[in-house]
């Protein structure tokens, strides 16, 4: 028996994975004559959120650094108080080996968001991860078309299976299967949130292929790209959602792999020198030493990123920078979620 007559889905999506899951849920809801509305977290306004008490709320977002990205956590933090049933979902870097989908990791995403929502009065009825294609193009090449199609199809039927249970009011806590891995990975989640995400924010640049269309600036969900010296410049609040890299019609947005090699060389030399030069016993406490080392790395990152931006103004030094970026080469590719017609066609 169907328990819910209305569903409200709030989604955040960089390259389309979470958005695709939302579309599938709406498709299955329509088959059951359930009203299902979608709202993009990018544009949702907290002061205008008004949800009937009998509406099921679903929040879905990708995982960044084994946690929900700040834009999603901030949305949940500002979410109004209520008593609705809520299902938490995520998309988390799925891969394919043979005919098997290899799962990603959720980390602390469900744990943190569950606490925040329960404090507001909501009832958590489910925590469901979906292993949609990994899109972290700064780290690895885009998955090939066959793999992407395979993962979309596998997750489509996974959504269908869970929707049948959700619509009948059943609790679905798939996340409990991964609780050990998620606990073990939690220190990395915290490290990424406190420091790592800022380093990745400064890994993007626009190559000499950029024609100044400013699509990346307009589409950035957190307004983390500004125009400096007539070129896109990434701010520290970038969340590495990969939307800009995915959408750029010129494939001009690349990751500065060469820059991070240079910074690492300077960092290892400078940090060691300063720690040896500053003889204070206080600096040699492990925690203090790590904080000090991060500050040194962060200063170098800001400095060299600005220098790189100036070098990009010259076409010759700009091309040299691209030469040392793996994302510059065709084999690396770009990822964006595909339409259902593509994987269904491949199946037939």
Regions found by a protein language model. Give the residues of each.
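FMN-binding flavodoxin-like domain, especially the glycine-rich phosphate-binding loop
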Residues: 2-7, 17, 30-37, 51-60, ...
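N-terminal beta1-alpha1 ligand-phosphate binding loop
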Residues: 6-25
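Hydrophobic residues within alpha-helices
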Residues: 21-25, 29, 113, 216
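Short gly/ser/thr-rich secondary-structure transition/capping motifs
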Residues: 37-44
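Short glycine-/small-residue-rich Rossmann-like dinucleotide-binding loops
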Residues: 62-63, 221, 249
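Ferredoxin-like iron-sulfur electron-transfer modules
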Residues: 189-219, 223-240, 253-267
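Short Fe-S-cluster ligation motifs
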Residues: 236-262, 271-286
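Hydrophobic alpha-helical transmembrane segments
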Residues: 281-299
């Amino acid at each position: 028996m169907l328990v819910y007559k209305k569903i409200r889905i709030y989604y955040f999506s960089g390259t389309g994975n979470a958005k695709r899951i939302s579309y599938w849920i709406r498709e299955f809801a329509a088959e059951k004559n359930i009203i299902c509305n979608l709202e993009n977290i990018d544009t949702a306004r907290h002061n205008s959120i008004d949800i009937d008490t009998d509406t099921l709320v679903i929040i879905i977002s990708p995982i960044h650094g084994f946690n929900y990205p700040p834009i999603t956590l901030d949305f949940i933090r500002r979410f109004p108080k209520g008593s609705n049933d809520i299902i938490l979902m995520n998309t988390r870097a799925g891969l394919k080996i043979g005919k098997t989908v290899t799962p990603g990791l959720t980390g602390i995403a469900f744990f943190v968001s569950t606490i925040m929502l329960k404090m507001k009065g909501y009832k958590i009825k489910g925590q469901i991860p979906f292993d949609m294609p990994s899109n972290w193009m700064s780290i690895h090449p885009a998955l090939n078309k066959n793999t992407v199609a395979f993962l979309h199809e596998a997750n489509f039927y996974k959504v269908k299976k869970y929707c049948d249970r959700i619509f009948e009011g059943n609790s679905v806590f798939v996340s409990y299967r991964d609780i050990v891995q998620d606990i073990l990975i939690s220190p990395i989640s915290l490290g990424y949130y406190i420091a790592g995400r800022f380093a990745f924010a400064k890994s993007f640049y626009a190559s000499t292929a950029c024609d100044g269309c400013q699509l990346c600036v307009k589409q950035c969900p957190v307004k983390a790209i500004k125009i400096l010296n007539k070129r896109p410049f990434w701010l520290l609040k970038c969340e590495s959602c990969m939307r800009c890299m995915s959408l750029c019609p010129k494939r001009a947005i690349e990751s500065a792999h060469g820059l991070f090699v240079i910074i690492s060389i300077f960092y290892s030399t400078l940090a060691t020198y300063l720690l040896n030069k500053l003889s204070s016993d206080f600096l040699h406490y492990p925690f203090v030493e790590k904080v000090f080392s991060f500050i040194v790395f962060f200063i170098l990152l800001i400095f060299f990123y600005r220098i790189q931006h100036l070098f990009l103004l010259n076409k010759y030094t700009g091309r040299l920078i691209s030469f040392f970026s793996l994302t510059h080469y065709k084999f690396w590719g770009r990822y964006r979620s595909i339409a259902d017609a593509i994987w269904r066609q491949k199946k037939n």
